[in-house]
Amino acid sequence: METTTPILSARSVHICFNLRGRVLHAIRGIDLDIQQGEVLAIVGESGSGKSVFTKSFMGLLDANGAITEGTIDYFGADDGRPIRLSDLKKEKDWLKVRGHEIAMIMQDPMTSLNPLKTIGEQIAEAVQLHQHLKGRAAR
């Protein structure tokens, strides 16, 4: 069987939050590979860590949260080099990745998508912003 490099790989990811001096272990040792073109749904009960885990891919954890163990790697960068997302700390580094390389639509579409615009218009708007394209080229 042929093996390919995933576009996104998480290995033994642990995420903790500091809550008034106490440590909350929100995620304990998750492994995940997503292949190019693959669609993945992460499901679970409310409070099970779905949003925390996926926010960690984008550097969107709350200020009191951190990846304390493990790695998250992105292998789809335009220049072919892997990006170790779990090591990015500065907002300026995330700005090079977020929207340009990876993006996400949060689970509540009413707060993520504008009901007055088509989805195509909203995707084109993101492309215009990040890729500096206009009109049809963005669509």
Regions flagged by a language model, labelled:
Residues 1-139:
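ABC transporter nucleotide-binding domains
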